[in-house]
Amino acid sequence: MGGVANLAEVRHLRPVPDPKPPPKLHERGEVKPSIRELERWATVLRLDCVRMLAVAKSGHLDSSLSAADIVAALYYRVLRHDPERPDWRGRDRFVLCKGHAAPIQYAALAQHGYFPLEDLMGLRQIGSQLQGHPDMRRTSGVEVSTGSLGQGLSMCLGICLALRLDGIDQSAHVFGLLSDGDCQEGQTWEAAIGAVHFGVTNLTAIVDYNHLQTDGTTEEVMDIGDVRAKFEAFGWDAVEIDGHDMSHVVESLERSRTVRKPVAIVAQTKKGKGVASMEDRFGFHGKPPSPEQAAEAVEELIERLDQQTRELHASESGGGEG
């Protein structure tokens, strides 16, 4: 229990000096966080997730870690959003279709000021705004209550059509983050057909394809095959990337805004990415880390954060770009 208590005390995630905070929406303009900055923020989000799960003693850590690079790129560089105006009409919408990975979204929202960082330690507690799956009625910044696999892409499509009715579908983009499990559900593919049928041009579906599920590998549970080819067959523009290569992640997300049809980004990822003892290993889905595992993971991530911060400061001092 000592490990958990120690984790709970490390609330603000500042073991080393932070680089510049993310610019406000109206200040972004041409100034965007560099790849190095985004990689560092992904580590911060991973550290948040480990701490949350260690205290909650339940949740889906490995599924959150696999999505950290994608979520960091979205919230710190790609999404048009404003914590001071969470209901701003012209904002982009992000739907965490794989709602069991709620900790990674909560971490990004807290780091942006949608709610206090301290609230992260209330994950899955009675009365907390941070439940095991995102709840749009409780949590600022959550667009849709998700968790039932297969329904997320349909909700993304519905939002796109609503934005069209409101006349803002040419400016507000909808991003949905799906899992292997989402792609095993027929409703996902009905939505894929519908998006092309209705001529949606402001929808990007990112598949966090980490190949592991509760009972085994995705291929063993229900093989979903060539996901990129499936989306292409339904008329989507589809690409496959390394979901942990920040340059590839950013490039594909920013490109998706310019394509005049629905875009699918199939991101090859590893469950538990960033924590050596959990990375690409079966058995951590829906299982919290032990106090010892959590303490080891925190130490590993803080060391990486320290190194990334020093490299970032060095590149800024030398005028280099990461």
What are these regions (language model features)?
Residues M52, S64-E190, V196-H197:
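Cofactor-binding active-site loop characterized by glycine-rich and histidine/acidic residues
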Residues G2-E39, V44-F115, G322:
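HDAC/HDAC-like amidohydrolase catalytic core signature
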Residues V95, T204, E240, A264-V266:
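Structured core elements
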